[in-house]
Structure formats: structure tokens, C-alpha cells
């Protein structure tokens, strides 16, 4: 088949699919994106970059600026696609990520070509992330709801222009309007369960600050891409004094960027990490809390292999790969009892679930795992089994390829 992949940060989530298609050796693989490829591409992939010809117009109503940005990107992507068309390229299937607008007009370039879109999340003013945390978000008024609603025109237009869609989890599918859910398949990107696996003989790890983590120590891990409330950094930091009272020998590793945000609002006073640490100043031993910053993935897995308890907290939002990687490594997990986590973790079966807003509950659950090695082993083994059964990379890729065949052939979405 002739396949066109679209992602502003190519290849993004499509890298494993591209590798599998390359291995089959019978496809023409073309990619379009703005940024340089962020990973080594298979040799058969032709990747073309395009630029933006204009920026946002000054003076626009702030609620439509996001839509204008996406239209600018969509126009640029469609122009690049049209150049490919003029050169004689017509794909059998277009598969792309619509999050930045690029997918809006591709069905106008090739009206008869099926379009499959990777849908991550639909913005809703109520019932999901925006109104979840009353401490950090006052009650939404009509203007807040209107501003959030104006994030959705690109999503709605892309849904209309797509023959079929795919999203990684049932929770993410549930964020979309009900009338569209019947055309959204649930297939996860997949976890490399060979790389993310328990170590038979875990090795000591030396952190950048010189701290040595040794097998058998009471190591607790907590991971955010960026330390922010969306991923429970405030609850975790507030749990530190409780944890150290219960388990003074525990070593807590907090992994992730400490400046800015990936999701949600920026901190109004400095950085979120510093604001919440100031709350517990004088109540904990900082020598046993290690902020590692971002670390390379090949250093991240050995840390998970040493972890005696892994904490994952999130608003009702997109599920992080880091949770599934921790589970794949056999970590005993303390997770928030929020919908995306509850889809993966069942309390006392393959992890422990706690109230997102309760630092004490988090500390007590960690302590339970540190003290009850038999329970921790049982939960960690079950956690890995969950990932092997539902999220193994090879299986997920094969399901993606099968879906692509169905959409390309017109068997679904026609």
C-alpha cells in the first residue's frame, strides 16, 4: 500500500507502526511534518517537512486564536500534500494526528482517500480535568466554559472529515461526544515489555547528584513529564512528611522537569514544585528526597527495576506511558482512584488505589507495600501480567495494522 502519515513532530506515536510496515517490505511510506524527525526512521520512509507561511493576526478575539493557529497549520500541511499529489502520489490511506490542525483539509486534497485519525482527548468543560481539582480551579463560569468549548472546532471538523478514528484507552474514548464513539477504535500504542521488564539481578544506579540506589533499599518512585498538579505533584509532595514518619528509611525519587508545565495552568508564583515544597518546609528530611529532573529512558527503566513502590496520580486525563512501563517492570503501584487509572489498575488485584487528594492515604499505601513484601510481589506480578495481556507492543502494532487495512479497504468507515 501507499501510506501517508501526518504528525507535526514526526514520527510521534507512529514509529512502531512504521518499523513494522518497513519490515514487510511492500509499502510506500511517506510522512509529512513540521519538525525534524525526532527518532531514526526506517530506510523506506520518505519524510517531507514543510513550514508555516504566516503567523497569527494581531487583534483577534482570544477565544479564536487557537482555531486560527490550527487553520494556519492545516493550510500548510494541505499545501505540502497537494505538492505530493502534483508529483503523482496518491495514498491508499492517510493516518495522522490531528491535535495541531494538520488533518483538517487532507480529505479535500484527496477526496476519495480514506482518512484514519489518532484522537487523544476531547476537551470538556465539566466532568473531566478542568473542574476536577477545586483547590486550584475555582468554579467554572460561562466564560470559562465558552473558552474551553472553543478548543473543540478543530476536533469536531476532523472527526467529520475522518473515515475512522483510534484512541489509546476506553477513558479517552469516553471524552468524545457519544455520537462519534462508534467510529473510534480503542488500541493502545503499546509498551515494549522486553525493555520494560523486571530485572533478575537489579543493578545499583547512581544519580546525577551522586546518590547511589541499591537493590533492596526502600526506593519509592514518582514520575511526571513535568511536575504539575495534573499529575498529582501537590499530593505527592504533601505526602512526604507522612511517609517519612511511617518509613524514615524510604528514599523518594521524583522524576521529571521542575520548570514550566506540560498540562494545565502555569504556577502563578514561580514553579509548582517550589510552592508545594514550601508548604512542608521543616517537616521532612530533604536528604531522602531526590529530584532527578528529566532522565533518558535507558536510565529510567533501571530505576523502575529498583522501585519497591511506584506512585502514579492523575486528573481524569490522558494516561501516561510511565504508569504502564512501571507495571511492565513489575512495580507495585499506588495509583489514584481516577477513571484513567481505574481502567488499568483494580484495587488490591494489580495495585492499590487511593484518593487523589489524600496525601495521608498515599503515604499509608506506600508504607503498606514497603512493609508487606509478599503483597508487593503479588501486585507487581499481576501488574506486569496486565500489561502483557493488554498492552504488549507487538500485539498493539498488529491491531493497528489490521485496523489500517480495514479502513483502507473500505470495510469500515466507508
Show which residues each predicted segment covers.
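Acceptor-binding helix/loop patch of EC 2.4 sugar-transfer enzymes
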Residues: 54-64, 113-153, 194-203, 257-270
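Conserved acidic donor-binding segment of nucleotide-sugar-dependent glycosyltransferases
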Residues: 347-348, 352-359, 368-374
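N-terminal subdomain of nucleotide-sugar transferases
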Residues: 1-46, 412
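Short hydrophobic beta-strand element within catalytic cores of glycosyltransferases
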Residues: 332-335
Amino acid at each position: 500500500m501507499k501510506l501517508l502519515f501526518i504528525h507535526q513532530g514526526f514520527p510521534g506515536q507512529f514509529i512502531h507502526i512504521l518499523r513494522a510496515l518497513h519490515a514487510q517490505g511492500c509499502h510506500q511510506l511517506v510522512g509529512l511534518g513540521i519538525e525534524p524527525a525526532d527518532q531514526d526512521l526506517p530506510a523506506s520512509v520518505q519524510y517531507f517537512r514543510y513550514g508555516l507561511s504566516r503567523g497569527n493576526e494581531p487583534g483577534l478575539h482570544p477565544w479564536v486564536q487557537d482555531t486560527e493557529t490550527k487553520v494556519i497549520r492545516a493550510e500548510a500541511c494541505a499545501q505540502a500534500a497537494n505538492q505530493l499529489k502534483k508529483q503523482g502520489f496518491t495514498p491508499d490511506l492517510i493516518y495522522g494526528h490531528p491535535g495541531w490542525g494538520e488533518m483538517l483539509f487532507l480529505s479535500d486534497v484527496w477526496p476519495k482517500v480514506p482518512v484514519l485519525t489518532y484522537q487523544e482527548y476531547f476537551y470538556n468543560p465539566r466532568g473531566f480535568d478542568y473542574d476536577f481539582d477545586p483547590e486550584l480551579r475555582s468554579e467554572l463560569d460561562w466564560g470559562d466554559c465558552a473558552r474551553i468549548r472553543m478548543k473543540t472546532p478543530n476536533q469536531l471538523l476532523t472527526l467529520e472529515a475522518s473515515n475512522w478514528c483510534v484512541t489509546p484507552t476506553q477513558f479517552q474514548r469516553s471524552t468524545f461526544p457519544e455520537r462519534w464513539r462508534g467510529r473510534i477504535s480503542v488500541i493502545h500504542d503499546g509498551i515494549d515489555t522486553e525493555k520494560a521488564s523486571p530485572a533478575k539481578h537489579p543493578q545499583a544506579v547512581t544519580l546525577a547528584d551522586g546518590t547511589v540506589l541499591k537493590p533492596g533499599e526502600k526506593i519509592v518512585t514518582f514520575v511526571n513529564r513535568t511536575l504539575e498538579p495534573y499529575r498529582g505533584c501537590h499530593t505527592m509532595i504533601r505526602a512526604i512528611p507522612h511517609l517519612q514518619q511511617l518509613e524514615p528509611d524510604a528514599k523518594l525519587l521524583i522524576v521529571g522537569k521542575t520548570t514550566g508545565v506540560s498540562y494545565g495552568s502555569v504556577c502563578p508564583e514561580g514553579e509548582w514544585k517550589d510552592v508545594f515544597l514550601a508548604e512542608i518546609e521543616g517537616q521532612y528530611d530533604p536528604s531522602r528526597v531526590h529530584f532527578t529532573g528529566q532522565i533518558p529512558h535507558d536510565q529510567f527503566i533501571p530505576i523502575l527495576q529498583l522501585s519497591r513502590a511506584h506512585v502514579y496520580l492523575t486528573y481524569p486525563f490522558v494516561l501516561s506511558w510511565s504508569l504502564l512501563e512501571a507495571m511492565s517492570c513489575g512495580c507495585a503501584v499506588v495509583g489514584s482512584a481516577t477513571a484513567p487509572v481505574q481502567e488499568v489498575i483494580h484495587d488490591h488485584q494489580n495495585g492499590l488505589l487511593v484518593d487523589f487528594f489524600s496525601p495521608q492515604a498515599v503515604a499509608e499505601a506506600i508504607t503498606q507495600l514497603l512493609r508487606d513484601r509478599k503483597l508487593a510481589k503479588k501486585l507487581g506480578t499481576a501488574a506486569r501480567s496486565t500489561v502483557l495481556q493488554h498492552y504488549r507492543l507487538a500485539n498493539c502494532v498488529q491491531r493497528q495494522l489490521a485496523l489500517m487495512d480495514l479502513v483502507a479497504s473500505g470495510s469500515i468507515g466507508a
